[in-house]
Design a protein with these regions (language model features):
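Short intracellular "coupling" helices and adjacent cytoplasmic loop segments at the cytosolic face
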Residues: 88, 96-128, 199-223, 227, ...
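ABC-type nucleotide-binding domain
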Residues: 325, 331-578
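Helix-loop-helix
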Residues: 48-50, 54, 60, 153-167, ...
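Transmembrane helix-loop-helix hairpins at lipid-water interfaces of multipass membrane proteins
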Residues: 18-75, 155-160, 271-275
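Alpha-helical transmembrane segments of multi-pass membrane proteins
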Residues: 16, 23-24, 68-87, 138-145, ...
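Membrane-integrated ABC transporters
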Residues: 1-32, 47-61, 78-83, 87-90, ...
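An intracellular "coupling" helix at the cytosolic face of ABC transporter transmembrane type-1 domains
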Residues: 15-16, 107-108, 124-133, 137, ...
Length: 578
């Protein structure tokens, strides 16, 4: 679908309002075009009649003009009110579509794109699109109708002078077209630069605690100043082009008046034109110049709106790498058997992370993955949830290839507890309920008790209605972790992934949370990724992964007797041996 056709699709639900808006704009144009003719008639004929005739007709004329302008005012109200509502509705529809698309896109998209730039598309771009969606067609319609209507009327009054005005207008349009190209380039550049500014701002504010803890405020100020100044230079370039565009058009508008005076005077001197007709031309020039100014604004609005819509379309045209297959079925009655069959994965052609992994995990079994950073432990679990697709091999749950089941049913059966806990802006209850939206308060309390966080919550003045702060800034790391565990208790999945769930906590917090995790992992297939080896001693099987793939596997005691890589890690951690 072309950009223009896609844009028009958003008008469909509001086509009644749209056409009524244009109809009201048409009425306004007719009124504006009629007044110079009425005034010309009055000065050239009506006011030259006798006093009695003028007195008889002037009140009728006044009432007619009054009604005409009341109708125009009502039309103006509709255009200003309902037209803007239509634009706001379209903006809302686009914003929802964009957000929905962001929810569908795969992790690989977010690996390559900056959040600040994505935010810019949701906020700045859509505002410009909304302004264009409402004002664009309306302004274009009014302007063209007035310009064409004025020319037709002027041509019927005295075509030689109208033809001269048309010549000046054509030159003006050629100038506008040439400047238009330059404006398009600068507006696109502006969009890129404001995205960089938003990205820099979000990065700095999101990491403000790190910034201040390292006393690196000056570095962040310099970084932001750099992107801010680049945006400023881009805007200056844009304004230079815009200034040339608007200044040139202003010159041509003045030239139209000069043309009327000079050529009109010559025609009067030759006896081909009378002063009243020239005055009528001058009145229509005012009607004619006003829409030209609106057209100038329209071109600027068009560039902003369509630049934003093209960026909007770039996202909407993105095809999620991870999607349900055509005949995908729901994953039901899950026991929790997991098979990694010759699984390999690479992010890029030259970046192989996992190579030929074969692993069978029985339902209810506790498996631990151990290895150096970058060995693919977290990636292996990401493949299980289909955040990425395997490059080679297959992953099966209860014998079903995960590519053959729906993403929603797959991920609904997998619970994830990570080191970096993300809490949404909202209350503690809302954050726990994220594990199963629609859960009752009693179910949320039950999950919190299992996660050993209920007593702490009840000690707070507002209890479960306590506001967490942005990303949970009002809570400690251990408290946030227990809330995330409560989420998974509420979700009640058959498969559990613990990804460095306690590595960032102090010993006391780890002790409390480890008990919660042990309760959580009961009767579930559990995969634990850990650097603290004390947390996995009781695992049914420990798998050591390094750059070459699966290196060792067995229970804690078996691997210690093997005296290999795992034993080395364990001794370094607990005995301080080389």
């Amino acid at each position: 679908m072309s950009t223009f056709k896609r844009f028009l699709q958003y008008y469909k639900p509001y086509k009644g309002i749209f056409f009524m808006d244009l109809f009201c704009a048409l009425i306004m144009c007719i009124v504006d075009l009629s007044f110079p003719l009425i005034l010309s008639y009055c000065t050239g004929q009506f006011f030259l009649k006798s006093s009695n005739e003028i007195l008889k007709g002037v009140f009728v004329l006044g009432i007619g003009l009054f009604v005409m302008y009341v109708i125009r005012a009502l039309c103006r109200y509709y255009v200003s009110c309902q037209g803007h509502v239509m634009g706001a509705n379209m903006e809302s529809d686009m914003r929802q579509d964009l957000f929905n698309q962001y929810q569908r896109l795969s992790f690989s998209y977010y690996d390559k794109h900056n959040t600040g730039v994505m935010m810019s598309r949701v906020v700045s771009d859509l505002f410009d699109i909304c302004e264009f969606a409402h004002h664009g067609p309306e302004n274009l319609f009014i302007s063209l109708f007035k310009i064409v209507g004025s020319f037709i009327i002027l041509a019927t009054i005295y075509w030689p002078l109208a033809l001269i005005l048309l010549t000046v207008t054509v030159v003006m349009m050629v100038f506008s077209y040439s400047q238009n190209k330059k404006m398009r380039r600068t507006f696109m550049e502006n969009r890129k630069k404001i995205g960089s500014v938003n990205a820099s701002l979000q990065d700095s504010l999101g990491g403000i605690r790190v910034v201040q803890s390292f006393a690196n405020e000056d570095i962040e100020i310099d970084k932001f100043n750099h992107s801010n100044m680049e945006f400023l230079e881009s805007k200056k370039d844009n304004y230079r082009v815009m200034g040339t565009f608007q200044g040139g058009n202003n010159f041509f508008q003045g030239l139209l008046y000069v043309t009327i005076i000079i050529f009109g005077g010559l025609f009067i001197a030759n006896g081909d034109l009378n002063p009243i007709v020239l005055a009528t031309f001058a009145l229509y020039i005012n009607v004619f110049v006003s829409p030209i100014e609106v057209l100038v604004e329209f071109t600027e609005m068009f560039q902003k709106g369509f630049s934003g819509f093209r960026r909007f379309e770039e996202v909407m045209n993105e095809v999620p790498e991870i999607q349900d297959s055509k005949n995908a079925k729901d994953l039901e009655n899950v026991s929790g058997n997991i098979d990694f069959d010759h699984v390999s994965f690479q992010y890029t052609e030259n970046e192989k992370v996992i190579d030929d992994v074969n692993l069978h995990i029985k339902a209810g079994e506790k498996i631990a993955l151990v290895g150096p950073s970058g060995s693919g432990k977290t990636t292996l679990c990401s493949l299980l949830s289909r955040f990425y697709d395997v490059t080679n091999g297959s992953i099966r749950i209860d014998g079903q290839n995960i590519k053959d089941v729906t993403l929603k049913s797959l991920r609904s059966n997998i619970g994830l507890v990570q080191q970096d806990v993300y809490l949404f802006t909202g209350t503690i209850e809302q954050n726990i309920a994220y594990g199963r939206p629609g859960a009752s308060h009693e179910e949320i309390v039950k999950a919190a008790k299992k996660a050993n966080i209920h007593d702490f919550i009840m000690s707070l003045p507002e209890g479960y209605n306590t506001f967490c702060g942005e990303r949970g800034t009002r809570l400690s790391g251990g408290q946030k972790q227990r809330i995330s565990i409560a989420r998974v208790f509420l979700k009640n999945p058959k498969i559990l992934i613990l990804d460095e769930a306690t590595s960032a906590l102090d010993n006391e917090s780890e002790r409390i949370i480890q008990k919660s995790l042990e309760d959580l992992s009961k009767n579930r297939t559990c995969i634990t990724i850990a650097h603290r080896l004390s947390t996995i001693r009781n695992a049914d099987e420990i798998v050591v992964i390094d750059a070459t793939g699966m290196h060792e596997r067995g229970t804690h005691d078996e691997l210690m007797k093997l005296n290999g890589t795992y034993a080395k890690y364990y001794k370094l951690q607990f005995e301080g041996l080389n």
